[in-house]
């Protein structure tokens, strides 16, 4: 035999892939999450409800005079001839749309 033939015979065999694939871990059954409670009402600082004393946060235009559930209207200020009304220029005494007394981010009533 020549040296070249001997070298070919002595080469290590190619690596074979393992016969068995690794077993997958057992799948866990999906766990039921506890049902979430109903979403909270808006923060007290954003509402003019009786509980908050009629106070709105600074982003909603200040405080209401009465705690009757009125809502701040920072962008609906009455004109000069409306200043004779008893309500504050930044607030409405009641919810005109029958809302909860909370203010929208834009300052209007719900």
Curated annotation (Swiss-Prot):
One BP annotation, GO: keratinization
Induction conditions: By calcium and UVB.
Keyword Glycoprotein: no
Residue span of region Disordered: 1-22
Compositionally biased region (Low complexity): 1-10
InterPro entries given in the database record: LCE
Record key words, sorted: Keratinization
Entry comment describing in which tissues the protein is expressed: Skin-specific. Expression was readily detected in adult trunk skin, adult arm skin, fetal skin, penal skin, vulva, esophagus and tongue. Not expressed in the cervix, rectum, lung, colon, or placenta.
Highest taxon above the source species: Eukaryota
Gene Ontology MF annotations: identical protein binding
Biased segments, Pro residues type: 11-22
Family of this protein: Belongs to the LCE family.
Record function comment: Precursors of the cornified envelope of the stratum corneum.
Note: Belongs to the LCE cluster present on 1q21.
Protein name per the record: Late cornified envelope protein 2B
Organism for this UniProt entry: Homo sapiens (Human)
Gene it is expressed from: LCE2B
